[in-house]
Amino acid sequence: MNLTAKLIAATLCLGLTGQALATELKHWPAEQAKQLEAMIAANANKGNFAVFDMDNTSYRYDLEESLLPFMENKGLITRDSLDPSLKLIPFKDTADHKESLFSYYYRLCEIDDMVCYPWVAQVFSGFTLQQLKGHVDELMASGKPVPVTYFEGDVVKASEVQPPKVFTGQVELYNKLMENGIEVYVMTAAS
């Protein structure tokens, strides 16, 4: 086999390998997958990009709602270590129960989302991004529900919150976009 024939054969093999490794949108409804494929083909390798949200878009559940009790349960965030400026309302303690930061966060959300969302973002101040990433990685790797307590009226309820679970369909989409030269960015308002 001459050099030209070898190069053509190698090129065909590489092309077929690329086809075999191409991501399929298996976890998308057929009609939506078809529309996404068409959009990707129309925008492939043109220097385009796609931007997505993280919480409840790239994965199910909210990161902060599980990271707060996860870190609190480990003693990494406590009422005592909380910046005094973040003690917006009195804690709702009883003779038998000391209110958790998770419960406090929920009560702030009952006042208004514009109170609790900035509050929970600021709770993580004092941690470096590297430290937070380590705790997020640990939470995500555990995959286990995080035990919580909160007040429902004047009754203390025990429950658990789920850590984020990555949507398989979104991973497929991100991979498909990147395989076609479309940069993918994931943004979040979470800490």
Predicted regions and their residues:
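Bacterial N-terminal signal peptides that target proteins for export
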Residues: M1-I8
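Sec/Tat signal peptide C-region and signal peptidase I cleavage site
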Residues: G18-A22
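Alpha-helical substrate-recognition element adjacent to the catalytic core
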Residues: T23-S191
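Bacterial N-terminal signal peptides
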Residues: A9-G15
